[in-house]
């Protein structure tokens, strides 16, 4: 089983080939390919490579499937005894990526 741990959108993700992942919005049109270069760990058929902090020459090829919005969260702020109440909603803009290949 081949997998990698990468850093993208301020998060560290465990990724595998052929699966899709939702990241923060990336300004790329759907259908286009992108390359993710910050590979922190790579496991290829039991052989583990660990970067300091990144593995040189290891890249992840991915295709942008679509842009979507995440689940709605509600933010509620209140100050006691002051009748101050603030209720807001937020939906994060996301980009869904399909991992095509993990290359060294």
Swiss-Prot record:
It holds the Pfam family Ribosomal_L21p. GO terms for biological process: translation. GO terms for molecular function: rRNA binding; structural constituent of ribosome. One of its GO terms (cellular component) is mitochondrial large ribosomal subunit. Its main location: plastid. It is found in: Plastid, Chloroplast. The keyword Transcription regulation does not apply. Keywords: Chloroplast, Plastid, Ribonucleoprotein, Ribosomal protein, RNA-binding, rRNA-binding. It comes from the Eukaryota. Belongs to the bacterial ribosomal protein bL21 family. NCBIfam families: L21. This protein binds to 23S rRNA. PANTHER family: 50S RIBOSOMAL PROTEIN L21, LARGE RIBOSOMAL SUBUNIT PROTEIN BL21C. Part of the 50S ribosomal subunit. This is Large ribosomal subunit protein bL21c. It comes from Porphyra purpurea (Red seaweed). The lineage of its organism: Eukaryota, Rhodophyta, Bangiophyceae, Bangiales, Bangiaceae. The gene is rpl21.
